[in-house]
Design a protein with these regions (language model features):
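Hydrophobic/aromatic-rich transmembrane helices and adjacent perimembrane loops
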Residues: 134, 303-351
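Aromatic/acidic, Gly/Pro-rich catalytic loop(s) in extracytoplasmic/lumenal soluble domains
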Residues: 338, 433-482
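Signature aromatic-anchored transmembrane alpha helix within multi-pass, membrane-resident enzymes
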Residues: 339-378
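Short acidic/glycine- and proline-prone juxtamembrane loop motifs at membrane-interface regions
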Residues: 129-142, 183
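Start-transfer (signal-anchor) and selected internal transmembrane alpha helices
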Residues: 1-33, 192, 198-221
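Membrane-interface transmembrane helices that cradle and orient dolichyl/undecaprenyl
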Residues: 60, 110-112, 148-170, 177-178
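Transmembrane-lumen/periplasm boundary regions of multi-pass, lipid-linked membrane glycan transferases
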Residues: 49-56, 183-295
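Transmembrane-helix motifs of polytopic, lipid-linked glycan transferases
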Residues: 91-111, 149, 288-290
């Protein structure tokens, strides 16, 4: 019986469809269970984000409360619908993370061959920094989401002789909404300058039909006009969109050093919400190979974009150290370049031998297994058992929801945050001791024991530094002679 050539085999013909399907299902499943394996508790930034999102109202928007508006609206309605819980706070990031993962896959698939984009996508969307973004209930994920969306939409416009007006309209709307995220005004200006300076893109734009250009220009211009009018009345909004609260120019280089510290900390653990190292050594090595490979033909848009995004990422890290997470986008592109370079070199050794080409799958599988599995384990166990990081997250909210269904809870800090619990529970949240409650619960050990109340129960947490969370006191009448 005549053997079928490899190219006719089912698994070979549909290898990329099968690969993308498995990756998509694994990624979606991972994000569904993410609340169970994600950071245990809430960081201060998540508590602040949930509080500002929930109390966001029409008057606040009209009065200039526009920073991170799209994300905060999603988070507000998530909390309103599900009630205050760690899941409701993180849900917007999980959904946006799911979309961001698929956008990264689509973007890399536009710029690279399917084999390269599949491998690079797998490495990035299952990495520790990406999973942290998708599991953190803060607007930080938007720093990676908007540029990825804009680059993908831009590639759909650039790559077509007659781009569909719908893509141009979506691009302009995305850029309009993105400017409410800090530093995205810089990215919008960066896109304009990059198109002007890049010869190929400049030629593409000149050849675009007038309708898409008119749609993009008019929508973006209208958005900047509305934002400008708002900023005139509320100049503090501009400060937050361009820099950060309390930023001074003297902080710039110190912020860069602080932001990059977890990226290159391979031998020590740093205190903060980021696990170190943020980027593993093998991933960094692939990215450096990719950076080296882009020096040939640097002025091609696909080659130069990653380097310019790296510079952009360093600049915004100077404004806010947490913005270092933006580097996940240029690193994704550089990793794809590195894989492309390695595979091309391997294939050039055996240009006519398909079996030799396929044999590269064995070392590649081992390499990727050694990169992905440790990264997943680092994420799952690092945020639970690394004290430098785990102590940055508080599980007070989860302990309250799991142990208290009704009664009065007295809190000494984050009062507005815990007050939200009253909307979906029978709890009453106060910031001072009442006089007439039959049972009192204190979040944290009270400084003084209320008169006529006796300690009846202490609710604890398994987290080391937060073992005693809630103190329950029951009212008792004074007995005669006491």
């Amino acid at each position: 019986m005549k053997k079928k050539p490899i190219s006719k085999l089912f698994l070979y013909r549909y290898r990329f469809i099968i690969g993308y399907t498995i990756l998509g299902l694994a990624f979606a499943l991972l994000l569904i269970v993410l609340p169970l394996i994600a950071q245990r508790g809430l960081s201060d930034a998540e508590i602040e984000s949930a509080t500002s999102s929930y109390y966001l109202g029409k008057n606040g928007i009209l009065n200039g409360d526009l920073v991170d508006l799209p994300y905060r609206l999603l988070q507000k309605y998530s909390i309103v619908f599900f009630g205050l819980s760690a899941y409701a706070i993180k849900l917007p990031s999980i959904l946006i993370g799911l979309l961001l993962g698929f956008l990264l896959i689509l973007l890399l698939n536009r710029w690279f061959k399917s084999n390269v984009s599949l491998l690079a996508s797998t490495l990035i969307v299952l990495s520790t920094p990406f999973l942290f973004l998708a599991g953190s209930g803060t607007p930080l994920i938007m720093l990676a989401f908007w540029p990825t969306l804009l680059l993908w939409l831009g590639s759909k416009i650039q790559g077509e002789k007659r781009p569909k007006p719908a893509y141009s309209l979506l691009f302009s709307l995305a850029m309009l909404v993105s400017i409410f995220t800090p530093y995205m005004i810089y990215f919008a200006l960066f896109c304009v300058v990059f198109v002007i300076l890049q010869p190929h893109l400049r030629f593409v734009v000149k050849d675009l039909p007038k309708l898409p250009l008119a749609l993009v220009g008019s929508v973006i211009l209208a958005g900047f006009v509305v934002l400008g009018i708002n900023i005139v009345g509320h100049p503090e909004t501009l400060m937050e969109l361009l820099f950060a609260k309390g930023f001074t120019i003297g902080d710039f280089f110190g912020n860069i050093a602080t932001g990059l510290a977890p990226v290159f900390s391979w031998y020590s653990s740093l205190e903060g919400v980021f696990l170190s190292p943020l980027i593993s050594l093998p991933t960094l090595a692939l990215a450096l190979i990719g950076l080296f490979s882009t020096t040939k033909g640097f002025f091609a848009s696909r080659n130069s974009i990653a380097t310019i995004l790296l510079v952009f990422g360093l600049v915004i890290t100077g404004f806010n150290p947490d913005a270092v997470i933006f580097l996940i986008l240029p690193f994704s592109i550089l990793v794809a370049h590195g894989l492309k370079y390695i595979l091309e070199k391997w294939y050039s050794l055996f240009p006519e031998n398909p079996y030799a080409r396929i044999s590269a799958l064995v070392p590649l599988t081992i390499l990727f297994g050694l990169m992905i599995i440790p990264s997943l384990l680092q994420y799952i166990y690092g945020y639970r058992y690394n004290p430098s990081v785990a102590n940055e997250f508080s599980d007070n909210l989860t302990v309250i929801r799991n142990n208290l269904t009704e009664g009065t809870v007295v809190v000494n800090e984050n009062y507005e945050f815990y007050k939200i619990l009253e909307d979906k529970t029978a709890l009453t949240i106060l910031n001072e001791q009442p006089q007439d409650a039959t049972e009192l619960s204190f979040l944290g050990k009270p400084e003084s024991v209320p008169e006529n109340y006796r300690l009846s129960r202490i609710i604890t947490s398994s987290k080391r530094d937060n073992s005693d969370i809630i103190y329950l006191y029951t009212f008792t009448e004074k007995l005669e002679g006491e």
